[in-house]
Curated annotation (Swiss-Prot):
Sodium- and proton-independent thyroid hormones and aromatic acids transporter. Mediates both uptake and efflux of 3,5,3'-triiodothyronine (T3) and 3,5,3',5'-tetraiodothyronine (T4) with high affinity, suggesting a role in the homeostasis of thyroid hormone levels. Plays an important role in homeostasis of aromatic amino acids. It is a multi-pass membrane protein. The gene is slc16a10. It comes from Danio rerio. The lineage of its organism: Eukaryota, Metazoa, Chordata, Craniata, Vertebrata. Residues 1-14, 32-41 have a biased composition (Acidic residues). The chain crosses the membrane at residues 67-87, 115-135, 143-163, 172-192, 205-225, 236-256, 287-307, 322-342, 344-364, 378-400, 412-432, 444-464. This is Monocarboxylate transporter 10.
Length: 505
């Protein structure tokens, strides 16, 4: 036992060479390769905040719970739609006070200039939508909505301190409107996380929130404007935006996000998440995205100028708030009815509901100058509100049908962004025609033409989608047939193989 020990002590001279071999062994260990694989899973858990079962599923396999916390989210989204579009739809009440506060009787373009305040506000809500869709995909519905409500609150507070139309363009027309845009769009996207089978009904209930506010806000604003004035009224409306901040905290996302295709260790999102070009590959979506803006050049004109038109025709004592209330009541009823009906209309055939709504809205806009009795205006507003609710409530369900749940955020965003141009331009043009012609008659006649044209364009969408599905079905059948032919042996070989043993026998 003592003899081998010196031999081991003498051999270290050749052994240093193998001792260097184990040193590189820790480098090929697969530990660093495992780290980037676990990071997307942690990000999914932090961003989605949902159960493990839903995290493991792809967005295509995800099934919404159809209720639960979704009912709370629905009520929060309803408040969002009400506070955002209720204030916008009631701008006709503030329009009269803006004319008296900032205008002059000697200004020939007074209505044209003042109408830009409301038009900028409504237009910017939709103009910012493509940017909002990117923020919604990157930051989530909750952060985007809460941040937008905070900006809207600041915009209304700042508007309560201005003393001329110039700053009002910025504070009310841009800052407040941008905040509303960031708060509004997530309220539509989050509904797809909780509902699928009842999505049409839920969208009808949510969008009915603007109808409830359109009914009540005109009376509330009239009382506030008479008692406390324009500036304190704007501060009261800022409280609505603060409540909207609290409502946005309920937007807990459930839809799992796909694993990022960016390089491991890179925190930059892929370009496809920032600008999703896949939605533009659908011809049906392209027709939809261009047909709806074409129909909306005259859509916002009655909401801005109808109150002034009533004062000019029926006198300042006319109960003009009743007209907005009629639009709001029937709009809410229409959203509930047509939202439920849309659940039973298969696929993209829901577009025909929008077509009918545009046709009726166009005809009713042309009927406004023909009403020389106040009761006739009430009937026109009732029908206009009913089909206005139809157009609004099925916008999100149609987007889900055309592009799928994973792409719906940017699909709605780009659509609303394209809607901003006609909704911004329409009311100032109507005000310009009034200042030049001395009457709103021509303005309302022209406002009814674009909805008729846009509705006719939308009729092509179901035909285009049906042709696409037939083509896809034919391609899949052809591919499966080729796969079966490649896997099965040729018929001649099988015949030869069966004949050979018979000849041997």
């Amino acid at each position: 036992m003592t003899e081998p020990e010196p031999t081991l002590e003498q051999e270290p001279t050749p052994e240093p060479e193998p001792t260097q071999e184990p040193t590189p062994e820790p480098t090929p260990e697969p530990e660093p390769t495992q780290e980037p694989e676990s990071e997307p899973e942690l990000e999914l858990k932090q961003e989605n905040g949902c159960t493990k079962a839903s995290e493991q599923k792809s967005p295509e396999e995800f099934e919404p719970p159809e209720g639960g916390w979704g009912w709370v989210v629905m009520l929060a989204s309803m408040w969002c739609n009400g506070s955002v579009f209720g204030i916008q739809n009631a701008f006709g009440i503030m329009f009269v006070y803006l004319l008296n506060e900032f205008g002059s009787e000697h200004d020939a373009d007074l209505r044209f200039k003042t109408a830009w305040v409301g038009s900028l506000s409504m237009g910017m809500i939709f103009f910012c939508s493509p940017i909002v869709s990117v923020f919604t995909d990157l930051l989530g519905c909750r952060i985007t909505a809460v941040g937008g409500a905070a900006v809207g609150c600041v915009g209304l507070l700042a508007s309560s301190f201005v003393t001329s139309l110039g700053p009002m363009y910025f504070t009310y027309g841009i800052v407040f409107a941008c905040g509303c845009s960031f708060a509004y769009q997530p309220s539509l996207v989050i509904l797809g996380h909780y509902f699928k089978r009842r999505l049409g009904l839920v969208n009808g209930i949510v969008t009915a929130g603007s109808s409830v506010f359109t009914i009540t806000l005109p009376y509330m604003l009239s009382g506030l404007l008479k008692s406390v004035g324009l500036y304190h009224t704007l501060r009261v409306l800022a409280i609505f935006m603060f409540i909207l901040m609290l409502a946005g905290l309920t937007y807990k996302p459930l839809l799992p996000k796909p694993v990022s295709s960016s390089k491991p260790g890179s925190r930059c999102p892929p370009l496809s998440r920032i600008f999703n070009v896949n939605i533009w590959k659908s011809l049906g979506y392209r027709i939809w995205a261009f047909g709806i803006p074409a129909a909306l050049y005259g859509y916002f004109v009655p909401y801005v100028h109808l109150m002034t038109h009533v004062e000019e025709r029926f006198g300042p004592e006319a109960n003009k708030e009743v007209l907005l209330a009629c639009i709001g009541i029937t709009s809410g009823v229409g959203r509930l009815i047509f939202g439920r009906v849309a659940d039973y209309v298969p696929g993209v055939n829901k577009v025909f509901l929008q077509v009918s709504s545009f046709m009726v809205i166009g005809v009713m806009s042309m009927m406004i100058p023909l009403c020389h009795v106040f009761g006739g205006l009430i009937a026109v507003c009732l029908l206009m509100g009913l089909f206005d609710g139809c157009f609004i409530c099925i916008m999100a369900p149609i987007a889900f049908e055309l592009v799928g749940s994973q792409n719906v955020s940017q699909a709605i965003g780009f659509l609303l962004g394209m809607m901003s141009i006609p909704m911004t331009v329409g009311p100032p043009i109507a005000g310009f025609l009034r200042d030049r012609l001395g009457s709103y008659d021509v303005a309302f006649y022209l406002a009814g033409i674009p909805p008729l044209i846009g509705g006719a364009v939308l009729c092509a969408i179901p035909w285009v989608e049906a042709r696409r599905k037939r083509r896809e079905a034919a391609n899949t059948a052809e591919n499966t047939e080729k796969m079966l032919e490649s896997r099965s042996p040729p018929l001649e070989d099988t015949v030869c193989r069966t004949e050979e043993p018979e000849s041997v026998i």
